[in-house]
């Protein structure tokens, strides 16, 4: 008796269904590194059009977190997909190495008591250690790049080029020195950039303070009155009592309507829109009378006394005054507020700053001298009560600026700093703000709402404070006049000479420089070296110059910058400003892509205290890096990205669907040689040609649309759907019979294998940018072997088909698929009540509209294969309907179809006539399915 199980083409897959990624990925990485895959790719891609994604440098401190992983994975998907699209897409990773966090860590580890040169040396060593740790994790994620030659902002050449960028901005005319209020962290002991500020709720005292008018006759005139009896006060409201010792004016809104109100305390000047609420705060309900009204422009240049100091206080008109809250009059301390500074500057009032860098009042400040500003609030309230000028006091919770490192409240404090001016006309007569806004217009944004966000930030941002009073940073290599504070007239030439020295010896070349080496004896008497360092955002914001313009394999401007959405305030902006303020005169990127932050499954931020932190190291050690990559790609990164063990398990199911599909495809290609066995498209079975159209259209959507516009979640959805719906639930389901039961080298089977070969190559190429490990594992089988890489190849080329023929083919098989779904639905009740097990136990009678019936009947005897039933009949009717019943045929031992011809061929008593022919004869012929 024949063992028919040995006559079917059931082949083992060289691609296991279990990926075992966590264990196998490290070995693949080692192999790729030994083969110098990245270097080979650069050779292969030479001469192609370039695509430059410039890496925003992560800070060299601490292990990478899940946000870092998302960022690097998204970048890697883009680099890989652009490479496969035919671009030369080098990736040079970088690190941000200077700055306060490293100083803090080095102080913790080694203390503060050491020479500054030794301190900087330890900072450099610490940064290098952190980079090595982070690099290992980034490589483990499968991120492809020039890891042996990354850029570091502490590299001597990069430090030198950062100095040169400073020179570019100096020559452009945007750099200036000024004593201006800046966000100041008392814990850092330094000014902060916009990007280093975060906002949190804070409880502050909220007080109403009366400033006594000096000349009530002048006040009466302003209100159109003949005179005023008794005391009169301009009432301000503030949440920062500690700034009152620096109060130098009161500001009124020129167009705001003010009332003069008689109260038991005296005459009060309040904004009309806020007077009612203010009087309630003061406890006045009886004995009040509105005496007159006027506008703020009439109050200009009236004078008051300071509420507790002997100081004349003028009334100014300020555009920043609103009637949103308070009293409509604003106490104005130019040392502690940008708007205050601006209005006092307009009136020629010289800035007075009573607070030093430690946040303490200087010695000449009565009562609070030597006291830190936060401690002074209660003393100042007591002082106001004593003078009788405190009208109300309460507490208020409001959003307040905090240091992003120390999480402590900031103060505005006027210090001598170097600024890049936003509204200062440069050497070309244009302001940096105008240039930057134009640069926003010239940039493409993903997602599109990034444009409005960045534009609003550029429009509202203050001048950029680029100087810092720190030790571990790129120095501002200027010589400054001892008396005037002016820069040396030959600053541009001197700066280049210093840059050349830094290029050889690093920043220590400046710190150890004797000024006599570069200046004449006379100049040495009048000029000193500037001791300030640069804002680290200037370092990273200059990398388009220090990296893109300096490395041969790169290009300027970059095609794309990709970072988290917080970088609208950070790197995107600092890069844009250095680009626009330099001789380049534009943003250093053509496109900006932003991704959201990672949260847990409940939308909460990652927090050690909550215990919801998901570390990338844990994910790749348990699931494999490809699962983490698939999660990042399948999540819509334009919003928050949710992650948890449960979410990762769901992602694993999607991965399994793709992997199982590939395993099936490879099993059925294991005896196929595309050179010897491929069937010409014209000779292929019709459904195979249809499957090729589906696969090509998938490639057109994924490679031609989703990858180019960075819509990776759509790409994943389409590829998983293709594997489960087009292949798993339709084409491969139908194909199994032909693959397993027809002769091994028959046209029917080789046609199917030809289609599978094209589908597999295309699918492997499509998944490879996302599933880089799985893609390479699969390419080892279908590509050129272990030394080959999927990245050495561009998107698959499908056999061409006439447009009209394709349209007709798709129309026909779309109708057949609709009929098949109806047949499957009709059989379901029979399966539910155990009348049949598999659909092959059923027969179907289909009623269909004329066109669909024509398509179905055109398949003839092969219709049953397309519908996965043992028998199918079709008749014409007005609408689609199916009647299904159990077959009365006998089951074929070999193909499992139920037919009435089992045993019809002598010697093959347990199989159908078709199987007997496939085993002992020339084999069946297929045309359609």
Curated annotation (Swiss-Prot):
Which keywords annotate this record? Aminoacyl-tRNA synthetase, ATP-binding, Cytoplasm, Ligase, Metal-binding, Nucleotide-binding, Protein biosynthesis, Zinc
Superkingdom is Bacteria
Q: Does Signal show up as a keyword for this record?
A: no
Name the GO cellular-component terms.
cytosol
**Cofactors that this protein relies on:** Zn(2+)
The record's Gene3D superfamilies line, in alphabetical order, gives: 1.10.730.20, HUPs (3.40.50.620)
User: Residue numbers of motif 'KMSKS' region?
Assistant: 605-609
Q: What EC number(s) does the entry state?
A: 6.1.1.5
Q: Which residues bind L-isoleucyl-5'-AMP?
A: 563
* Residue ranges of the motif 'HIGH' region: 58-68
Q: Does the keyword field hold Cytoplasm?
A: yes
This entry's Gene Ontology molecular function terms read:
aminoacyl-tRNA deacylase activity; ATP binding; isoleucine-tRNA ligase activity; tRNA binding; zinc ion binding
Q: Quote the catalytic activity from the record.
A: tRNA(Ile) + L-isoleucine + ATP = L-isoleucyl-tRNA(Ile) + AMP + diphosphate
| Binding residues annotated for Zn(2+), in chain numbering | 892, 895, 912, 915
Cellular localisation? Cytoplasm
Q: Record's Pfam families?
A: Anticodon_1, tRNA-synt_1, zf-FPG_IleRS
Functional description taken from the UniProt entry: Catalyzes the attachment of isoleucine to tRNA(Ile). As IleRS can inadvertently accommodate and process structurally similar amino acids such as valine, to avoid such errors it has two additional distinct tRNA(Ile)-dependent editing activities. One activity is designated as 'pretransfer' editing and involves the hydrolysis of activated Val-AMP. The other activity is designated 'posttransfer' editing and involves deacylation of mischarged Val-tRNA(Ile).
* Annotated domain remarks: IleRS has two distinct active sites: one for aminoacylation and one for editing. The misactivated valine is translocated from the active site to the editing site, which sterically excludes the correctly activated isoleucine. The single editing site contains two valyl binding pockets, one specific for each substrate (Val-AMP or Val-tRNA(Ile)).
Q: What protein family is recorded?
A: Belongs to the class-I aminoacyl-tRNA synthetase family. IleS type 1 subfamily.
Kindly give the PANTHER family that the UniProt entry links to this protein: ISOLEUCINE--TRNA LIGASE, MITOCHONDRIAL (PTHR42765:SF1), SOLEUCYL-TRNA SYNTHETASE (PTHR42765)
What is the protein named? Isoleucine--tRNA ligase
Organism whose genome encodes this protein: Neisseria meningitidis serogroup A / serotype 4A (strain DSM 15465 / Z2491)
């Amino acid at each position: 008796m024949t063992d028919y199980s040995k006559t079917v083409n059931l082949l083992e897959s060289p691609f296991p269904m279990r990926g075992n990624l966590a264990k196998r990925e490290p070995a693949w990485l080692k192999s790729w590194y030994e083969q110098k895959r990245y270097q080979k790719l650069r050779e292969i891609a030479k001469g192609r059009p370039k695509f430059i994604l410039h890496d925003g440098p992560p800070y060299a401190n601490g292990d990478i977190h899940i946000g870092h992983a998302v960022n690097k994975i998204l970048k890697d998907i883009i680099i890989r997909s652009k490479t496969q699209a035919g671009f030369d897409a080098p990736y040079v990773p970088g690190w941000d190495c200077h700055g306060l966090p490293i100083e803090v860590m080095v102080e913790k580890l080694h203390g503060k008591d050491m020479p500054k040169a030794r301190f900087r040396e330890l900072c450099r060593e610490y940064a290098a250690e952190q980079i090595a740790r982070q690099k290992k994790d980034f490589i483990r994620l499968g991120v492809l790049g020039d890891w042996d030659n990354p850029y570091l902002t502490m590299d001597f050449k990069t430090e030198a080029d950062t100095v040169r960028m400073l020179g570019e901005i100096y020559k452009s005319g945007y750099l200036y020195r000024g004593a201006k209020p800046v966000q100041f962290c008392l814990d850092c002991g330094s000014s902060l950039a916009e990007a280093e500020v975060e906002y949190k709720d804070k409880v502050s005292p909220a007080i109403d303070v009366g400033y006594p008018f000096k000349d009530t006759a002048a006040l009466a005139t302003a209100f159109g009155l003949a005179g005023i009896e008794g005391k009169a006060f301009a009432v301000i409201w503030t949440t920062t009592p500690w700034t009152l010792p620096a109060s130098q004016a009161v500001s009124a809104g020129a167009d705001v309507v003010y009332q003069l109100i008689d109260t038991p305390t005296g005459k009060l000047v309040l904004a009309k829109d806020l007077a009612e609420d203010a009087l309630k705060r003061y406890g006045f309900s009886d004995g009040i009378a509105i005496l007159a009204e006027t506008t703020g422009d009439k109050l200009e240049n009236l004078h008051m006394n300071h509420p507790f100091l002997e100081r004349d206080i003028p009334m100014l008109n300020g555009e920043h005054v609103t009637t949103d809250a308070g009293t409509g009059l604003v106490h104005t301390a130019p040392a502690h507020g940008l708007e205050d500074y601006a209005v006092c500057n307009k009136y020629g009032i010289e800035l007075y700053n009573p607070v030093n860098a430690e946040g303490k009042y200087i010695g000449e400040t009565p009562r609070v001298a030597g006291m830190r500003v936060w401690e002074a609030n209660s003393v100042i309230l007591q002082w106001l009560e004593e003078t009788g000028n405190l009208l109300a006091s309460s507490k208020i919770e409001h959003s307040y600026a905090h240091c992003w490192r120390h999480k402590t409240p900031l103060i505005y404090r006027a210090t001598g700093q170097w600024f890049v001016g936003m509204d200062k006309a440069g050497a070309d007569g244009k302001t940096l703000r105008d240039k930057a806004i134009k640069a926003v217009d010239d940039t493409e944004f993903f997602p599109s709402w990034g444009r409005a966000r960045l534009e609003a930030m550029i429009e509202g941002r203050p001048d950029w404070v680029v100087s810092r009073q720190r030790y571990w940073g790129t120095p501002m290599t200027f010589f400054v006049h001892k008396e005037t504070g002016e820069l040396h007239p030959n600053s541009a030439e001197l700066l280049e000479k210093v840059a050349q020295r830094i290029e050889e010896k690093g920043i220590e070349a400046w710190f150890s420089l004797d000024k006599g080496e570069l200046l004449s004896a006379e100049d040495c008497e009048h000029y000193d070296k500037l001791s300030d360092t640069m804002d680290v955002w200037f370092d990273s914001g200059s990398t388009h110059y220090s990296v893109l313009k300096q490395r041969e394999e790169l290009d300027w401007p970059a095609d794309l910058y990709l970072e988290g959405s917080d970088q609208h305030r950070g790197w995107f902006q600092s890069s844009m400003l250095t680009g626009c303020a330099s001789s380049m005169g534009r943003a250093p990127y053509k496109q900006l892509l932003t991704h959201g932050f990672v949260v847990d499954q409940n939308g909460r931020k990652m927090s050690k205290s909550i215990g919801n932190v998901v570390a990338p190291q844990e994910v790749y050690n348990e699931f494999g890096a490809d699962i983490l990559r698939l999660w990042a790609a399948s999540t819509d990164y334009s919003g928050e990205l949710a992650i948890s063990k449960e979410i990762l398990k769901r992602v694993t199911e999607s991965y399994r669907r793709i992997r199982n599909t590939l395993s099936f495809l490879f099993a059925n290609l294991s005896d196929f040689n595309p050179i010897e066995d491929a069937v010409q498209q014209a000779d292929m079975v019709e459904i195979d040609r249809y499957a090729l159209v589906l696969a090509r259209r998938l490639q057109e959507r994924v490679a031609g649309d989703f990858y180019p516009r960075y819509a990776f979640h759509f790409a994943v959805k389409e590829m998983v759907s293709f594997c489960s719906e087009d292949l798993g639930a339709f084409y491969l389901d139908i194909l199994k019979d032909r693959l397993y039961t027809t002769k091994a080298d028959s046209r029917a089977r080789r046609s199917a294998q030809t289609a599978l070969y094209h589908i597999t190559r295309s699918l492997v190429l499509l998944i490879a940018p996302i599933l880089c490990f799985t893609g390479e594992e699969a390419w080892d089988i279908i590509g050129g072997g272990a030394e080959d890489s999927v990245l050495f190849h561009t998107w698959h080329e499908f056999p061409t088909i006439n447009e009209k023929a394709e349209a007709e083919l798709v129309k026909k098989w779309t109708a057949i698929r609709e009929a098949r779904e109806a047949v499957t639905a009709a059989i379901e009740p029979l399966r539910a009540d155990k009348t049949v097990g598999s659909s092959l136990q059923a027969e179907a009678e289909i009623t269909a509209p004329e066109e669909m019936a024509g398509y179905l009947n055109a398949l003839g005897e092969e219709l049953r294969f397309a519908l996965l039933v043992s028998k199918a009949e079709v008749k014409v009717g007005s609408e689609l309907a199916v009647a299904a019943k159990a077959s009365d045929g006998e089951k074929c031992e070999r193909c499992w179809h139920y037919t009435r011809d089992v045993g019809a061929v002598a010697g093959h008593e347990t199989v159908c006539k078709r199987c007997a022919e496939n085993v002992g004869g020339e084999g069946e012929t297929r045309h359609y399915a």
